Each structure stands twice: as structure tokens, then as C-alpha cells.
Amino acid sequence: MDSTRNSASSNSTGCFTDQKKRKALYEVFKKLSGVDCQRNEGNVVEGVTCYYGEMNKEQFHVAIFQTDKNESLFSERVFDLFDTNHDGLLGFEEFARALSVFHPSAPIDDKIDLSFQLYDLKQQGFIERQGVKQLVVATLAASGMSQSDEIVESIIDKTFVQADTKHEGMIDEEEWMDLVFRHPLLLKNMTLQYLKDITTTFPSFVLHSQVEDT
């Protein structure tokens, strides 16, 4: 896995380079962000249609979790990683790059790389126990679940026993990749199934209509 953090820093929109898919994703973006759909829409630069507007963290949380409940550390971390100019907002291209990683057809390496970055809270190049604990607790809370601190610590202990093969008290990128390949369910929350068919149907929380072919 490349340590240059390709999934968040890349300018590629990956699974959303196709114009029909970009337009469909923009419909979701418009609905969630409330952008004026008539303003500056449709400018073409080098054969690519450019879309405009901005989305805040709360709106992005709805895109990730398909609910308007309180945002979580997970969605906040994803948002911050793709907010490349650190203005607290995502433009459409940043939004497309973020959701591209969550597409069912996105390369597994991109999902592994982004998941590592999410747990590496301090961006140090390795995962600490505290980073794992914060995200485990946040993910459970976002799912409407809660566990005692004792059970959470037990989960983290087991994770580090399996992952920290170098016995350094941390998990580096190589160890994380090995762990994920042994336990693919660790990437379950890195895939949003609704994105697979985004050109034919929107998630029900956004729209109840179909995208027309153009």
C-alpha cells in the first residue's frame, strides 16, 4: 500500500468519470446540499462537465449513512480527509472523489488505504489503540449500539494481538493490509451499495424518482 495517501489526495473521481454517472451523482449532491441546480451547471472543460456547489459535514453525513441523525466520527474523518482546501466544505469534485472510494467497484487497495487513514487519527503513518477505540465507539453509536468499555477494550486487545505482528504497540500499513485480507468484514463500512446503481435509481432518502437517460 502506497504511503502517499493516494485515495484522499488523488484528483481522480475514479468510478464517477463516466458522464452519466457524474450527472446522477450530482443529482444526489444537489438534493443533499440544496445547491441551485441552474447556476453554472454544465460547463465543459476538456470534455468533462463541471458541476458547482458546496456541501457541509452534516449534509455529507447523510450521504454516507443515509440518515439525518447526528454525524459520527467516521463521516467526519472521511469529510476532513477529502476537504483538501480545509474550508469546512466539499465541492462536487471533492464529494465525487470521496464517494468513489465507497463505490462497490472501487479498487480494494483504495478502500484499504482510506480505512487506514481513518484509523490513523493523528496522520502519523500508524494506528494507535486510541484511534481504534474512538472509531469503534463512534461506529457503534452511529449504528444505535453501545457496549461497555470492558467489551470495547476486549475488541481492541484482540485486534492488536492479530494485527501488531511486529509487537511495536501500533499497527503500520503493512500490518493493516494483512489484517484486512484475513478479515474482509473490516471493510464492510467502506462500501455504499446504492452507488452501484446510481444511474438508474437514487437512494430512497434522497429521491423517489429515476434518473433519465440523456
Curated annotation (Swiss-Prot):
Site (Involved in dimerization): S143
SMART domains linked: EFh
One Pfam family linked to the record: EF-hand_7
InterPro entries: CNBL1-10 (IPR045198), EF-hand-dom_pair (IPR011992), EF_Hand_1_Ca_BS (IPR018247), EF_hand_dom (IPR002048)
An example Gene Ontology biological process: calcium-mediated signaling
Domain of life from the UniProt record: Eukaryota
Main location: cytoplasm
GO molecular function: calcium ion binding; kinase binding
Location(s) in or outside the cell: Cytoplasm; Nucleus
This protein's UniProt keywords: Calcium, Cytoplasm, Metal-binding, Nucleus, Phosphoprotein, Repeat
Occurrences of domain EF-hand (ranges): 33-69, 70-105, 107-142, 151-186
Modified residues (Phosphoserine): S204
GO cellular component: cytoplasm; nucleus; plasma membrane
Amino-acid positions noted as binding Ca(2+) in the UniProt annotation, renumbered to this chain: D83, N85, D87, E94
Role summary: Acts as a calcium sensor. CBL proteins interact with CIPK serine-threonine protein kinases. Binding of a CBL protein to the regulatory NAF domain of a CIPK protein lead to the activation of the kinase in a calcium-dependent manner.
Subunit relationships: Homodimer. Interacts with PP2CA.
Family the entry assigns: Belongs to the calcineurin regulatory subunit family.
Name of the protein: Calcineurin B-like protein 7
Organism: Arabidopsis thaliana
